[in-house]
Amino acid sequence: LAFIITMSCIDFTNSSMDVYDQYHANNTHGSLYSFYINVRKMMLSKPKGYKEEDVQALLSNADSEEQTTVDKEEMPNIIAIMNESFSDLNVVGDLQTSEDYMPFIHSMTKNTIKGQLLVSPFGGYTCNTEFEFLTGLSMGVLPRGSVPYLQYVSKQYPFSLPSHLDELGYKSVAVHPYLGRCWNRQKIYELMGFDEFISFDNIKKYMDEDDIEYVRYYVSDRTSFKLVTDQLENKKPGEKMFLFNVTMQNHGGYTYDGGEFPTVTISNLQGHYKEAEQYLSLIKESDKAFEELVRYLKNYDEPTIVVMFGDHQPAVEQEFYEELYGKSLSKLSTEELQQRYKIPFVIWANYDIESQDDLKTSPNYLSDLLLDTANVPKNEIENFTSEVRNDVPQINAMGHYDSDGNWVSRDEDTSNALDKYEAVEYYMLTRKENKDEKENKDDKK
């Protein structure tokens, strides 16, 4: 029964457990069968030559790196938004539309860092991108087809972003306006060190029912962001907050016929792709909501930094993607396929930061980049991933781009940096809880 309940919350829309080509594995075998045939491959195996003391020394060296000492008063509030299915499909191929579906984000330049994430999932498995961001660990060195939230995170994880920020005096609140049981978030967020979890299950404690806005079937981004800003409004004086928001507005599928929002239309493709157009219309709604959030934060009287990023591209019509590519998906090389795994991100602050554009990275490095930008001290994992990022700036479950921008398939990888990463990740996910961690977990109950 527990398995059935868990699986009922998984967004299986045109996705599967095969990280090389999730869409085709699903169509060939079906989602449940794809899950079944990969289960045997998902167990963590000790890396070749692994020694726990070597990993501990590696992390100790990373932790000892000199960092700027920052007064708590100078540290900003931190908002991280993982926006459901948020992507710019123009990365796949030339896409022309009746209007800009991301006008505000495209216009942002001041105090703004924009770029591209290389993610592992397509059309689903949101939790894997989320896992990478919150832990600094990578799907690229885990067994193919892994779902860490369901397999590997079963004890207190003191190296997560919320746990680290808790040590720095932050209050950490997760906001996800959907069922808390999905992807086991109710349990995972507790183990990750969040102090509070606002989900659809308890949303009426935080907001009047009449104030909850829906777009199609899901809580809107505007409402989701309002739950975030309400936390800022109601926090204690001097309290620093980390707010992690996983949105729902743009979740698939894209066949809603209520007509409650204007439609962005595609103008340069031969086919008529209603799902893709509905999706693009939703992205424009997200862009509007983000503009409202930034406007609010501009007038907020405490330094605050926000990052927004997507989890995966949407599973809209296969024919749409094939026309963008100019060829059948079955004819794509693994490197060509990576265009379906590239997602935008934006970092903005209501104070001066150095602006950048077209920065290429991955979700596992994004929290490190965020803390660097915010001038917040980092832990040993974040320092370690900073070093790996120099050699492997982008990584996903299929391979990585090296420092020269060359694609390296996972089966062809010989990177010493990734060997170390795999050892660190194995250690982090298999280590035993110490006494302090067990006591901390008990205190959070």
Language-model features: where?
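General structural feature for long, well-ordered alpha-helical segments within catalytic domains
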Residues: 12-19, 31, 35-38, 224, ...
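Generic intrinsically disordered, low-complexity segments enriched for polar/acidic and small residues
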Residues: 9, 17-20, 30-33, 47, ...
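Solvent-exposed soluble domains appended to multi-pass membrane proteins
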Residues: 60-76, 80-83, 88-445
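Helix-hairpin-helix/helix-loop-helix acidic hairpins
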Residues: 30-73
